[in-house]
């Protein structure tokens, strides 16, 4: 039986850093989440990745493994925004909703990536919902 990254990461050595422990826990949560959800062509998966500085989001069709649309806080129109990271997350949520509409998608499956639903993740999700995505 092949071991996944989450399985091997679950066996943490004594004295592991707090950030490493949090990363391992997030990977385990994401692995559990991914067992239950998958994106299709009509209803792709809205995948969120959050770093300390940026947030990235993709619409993924898991049936053929393609990315339908993507948005990120690294893009020039988002980088120029005044405000905090949450304001940038709201703008990224608006962008992904616009790009999903342009691709003919109105319903998605939300994959929070193992992150807790709050702060920047919730702000992105709420902005995407307000701009027409259903999930």
UniProtKB/Swiss-Prot annotation:
Disulfide bonds: none annotated. The keyword NADP does not apply. Pfam families: Ribosomal_L18p. It comes from the Bacteria. GO terms for molecular function: 5S rRNA binding; structural constituent of ribosome. Residues 1-23 are annotated as: Disordered. Keywords: Ribonucleoprotein, Ribosomal protein, RNA-binding, rRNA-binding. GO terms for cellular component: cytosolic large ribosomal subunit. SUPFAM superfamilies: Translational machinery components (SSF53137). One of its GO terms (biological process) is translation. Belongs to the universal ribosomal protein uL18 family. This is one of the proteins that bind and probably mediate the attachment of the 5S RNA into the large ribosomal subunit, where it forms part of the central protuberance. Part of the 50S ribosomal subunit; part of the 5S rRNA/L5/L18/L25 subcomplex. Contacts the 5S and 23S rRNAs. PANTHER family: 39S RIBOSOMAL PROTEIN L18, MITOCHONDRIAL, LARGE RIBOSOMAL SUBUNIT PROTEIN UL18M. This is Large ribosomal subunit protein uL18. It comes from Mycobacterium marinum (strain ATCC BAA-535 / M). The lineage of its organism: Bacteria, Bacillati, Actinomycetota, Actinomycetes, Mycobacteriales.
């Amino acid at each position: 039986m092949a071991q996944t990254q989450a399985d091997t990461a679950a066996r943490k050595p004594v004295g592991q850093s707090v950030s490493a422990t949090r990363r391992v826990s997030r990977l385990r949560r994401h692995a559990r989440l991914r067992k239950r959800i998958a994106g299709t062509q009509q209803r792709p998966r809205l995948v969120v990745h959050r770093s300390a500085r940026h947030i990235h989001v993709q619409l993924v069709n898991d049936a053929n493994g393609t990315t339908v649309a993507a948005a990120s806080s690294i893009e020039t129109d988002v980088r120029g925004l005044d405000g905090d990271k949450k304001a940038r997350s709201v703008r990224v949520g608006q962008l992904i909703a616009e790009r999903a509409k342009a691709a003919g998608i109105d319903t998605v499956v939300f994959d929070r990536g193992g992150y807790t639903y709050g702060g920047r993740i919730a702000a992105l999700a709420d902005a995407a919902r307000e701009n027409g995505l259903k999930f």
